[in-house]
């Protein structure tokens, strides 16, 4: 591999590390918001557990769990790409 191509791939790797860091930060933020939503829901009075607010909170929490899982998968995928590119320039 010539120096120019190698340097370009190293630049791509650096960009991917930045993206992965942002994805991880988003993952943490979504997880924290989900914990807050769960705490909100379970601190509701029992007589509200069958109401619309509780149901909406459950749905939001479920959606955030799905988003969190997808963000984790994305982070793992980005790291795999980085590993392959690092092997290519090694």
Mark where each language-model region is.
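Long, low-complexity or tandemly repetitive, helically biased scaffold regions used
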Residues: 2-90
